């Protein structure tokens, strides 16, 4: 039960009504028996600055940042973790000693989720679709030990991101880039980081056709609502192993939770909470 000592955590983005983060985090909070609550807030771009100053004034413990604010939130923060700074996007903010500090846990979440189905990720040929905030985090984490290609509807954005991370990570083999017509037959892993197919706009075509994928390819979509987005339905038709965004949501959320509270939540409890929501 909330009282005057309850600490507030939250999620900001637009939209947020589809999010499973509140039930996931609140279940973890209840499991640990700590006095916190996690709420979702639909925030427009013009109110981002006010959100950060308000969070500091109200002594909110911290909040997650989702689409479309992961990049623009950075200019309103007091400090940014070195990895988040290199990524160029923030998905987690902690308010500490009156300062808003930004972190990024998306890349770690994506990597841990992929490794559950694809094994250790070393020297894999990976195709990343999209160049937004989530893409930046995933690229930064996966490019360290693998061969990446980034594609985007706007090829110039893909080029800028590939060149930026090739330089930051001192890649001997530069990150490749292309447009949405790139031949996909040689990729071990294909990962969609765009919101194409996300609730409520689910009646759309897949972001790229998948008929030429490798026989044993792993296809991941960061979308988790719907559970089986159109991109994964397409992948299943061609025999691919598929992963939706639920695992990443849990793993990145667990790292965020630890940043805020100093406590490790139970991953199983968080997954179970989401699965119970899905069945409703």
Curated annotation (Swiss-Prot):
Q: Where does shikimate bind?
A: 19-21, 66, 91, 106, 224
Which residues hold NADP(+)? 82, 130-134, 222, 245
For biological process, the GO terms are: amino acid biosynthetic process; aromatic amino acid family biosynthetic process; chorismate biosynthetic process; shikimate metabolic process
Pfam families, A to Z: SDH_C (PF18317), Shikimate_DH (PF01488), Shikimate_dh_N (PF08501)
Reactions catalysed, semicolon-separated, are: shikimate + NADP(+) = 3-dehydroshikimate + NADPH + H(+)
Catalytic residues (positions): 70
Keyword set, alphabetical order: Amino-acid biosynthesis, Aromatic amino acid biosynthesis, NADP, Oxidoreductase
Gene3D superfamilies tied to this protein: Leucine Dehydrogenase, chain A, domain 1, NAD(P)-binding Rossmann-like Domain
Q: What molecular function terms (GO) are annotated for this protein? A: NADP binding; shikimate 3-dehydrogenase (NADP+) activity
Pathway(s) the chain acts in: Metabolic intermediate biosynthesis; chorismate biosynthesis; chorismate from D-erythrose 4-phosphate and phosphoenolpyruvate: step 4/7
Q: Which InterPro entries match?
A: Aminoacid_DH-like_N_sf (IPR046346), NAD(P)-bd_dom_sf (IPR036291), SDH_C (IPR041121), Shikimate_DH (IPR011342), Shikimate_DH-bd_N (IPR013708), Shikimate_DH_fam (IPR022893), Shikm_DH/Glu-tRNA_Rdtase (IPR006151)
Uppermost EC category = oxidoreductase
* EC number(s) reported in the record: 1.1.1.25
- Subunit arrangement? Homodimer.
What this chain does, per the record? Involved in the biosynthesis of the chorismate, which leads to the biosynthesis of aromatic amino acids. Catalyzes the reversible NADPH linked reduction of 3-dehydroshikimate (DHSA) to yield shikimate (SA).
What is the similarity comment for this entry? Belongs to the shikimate dehydrogenase family.
Question: What protein name applies here?
Answer: Shikimate dehydrogenase (NADP(+))
User: Which organism was this protein described from?
Assistant: Methanococcus maripaludis (strain C7 / ATCC BAA-1331)
